Amino acid sequence: MKYTEKDPINYYKYIRETYENSYLAEDTTQIIIGINCSYLDSTMYSYEDIRDFIKNKNGISDFSGLFGVFAYETIHYFERINEIKSEQYYFPNFIFSDADAYLHFDKKTLSFTFHGDKSKYEDILTKCKEYEKNSKQLKKKNNKYSILTNKIKEKNNFIKIVKKAKKFIKEGDIFQVVLSTQMLISSNLDPMEFYEELSKQNPSPYMFYFPTKYGDVIGSSPEILL
């Protein structure tokens, strides 16, 4: 079936009205919507449990499997690091989703295919187009935000870790490192609206929107911003 450029996001929004536990992931060639997911996280399963689950999983498509994120603290599963920093907010060491069905969009051919039990999700697929028409009539709200992070303090901290990284590189301990800063923002902006705006301002090779009970996780490659 053919689709227009705005269809995938609208389809995803409509799907989430019925199946809230659904994610969206995209790269330069495709968009994948994982529908009606069950979740596996570190509060219920060990890392070994996840590996066993993957080995015994029967996929409904070539790209099916667990989708999720690792928190920084997951490094303790693989490396002996004594330092454990206090958390600024709670998030499990890892959380993965196992989708019951998939909607796959091919960006080159502008066609999409469904993978899963069609009889179970047929009603949603037929009503996605109607949702797209109604969404165009919605009025945009005035979005506001305020930065709560002390930007000067965060900048100074970032400079310190850059100097520390340079020292490690010179000493031969590391040859590549990913540095980052944290920013706390208060806003009335819906997370999905943020994702849509991010895709316009920073159309990166890989992006995802992953809602969880611990908070919505949005990811984007930073190459263009850099």
State where each predicted segment sits.
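Extended alpha-helical targeting/anchoring segments
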Residues: 1-226
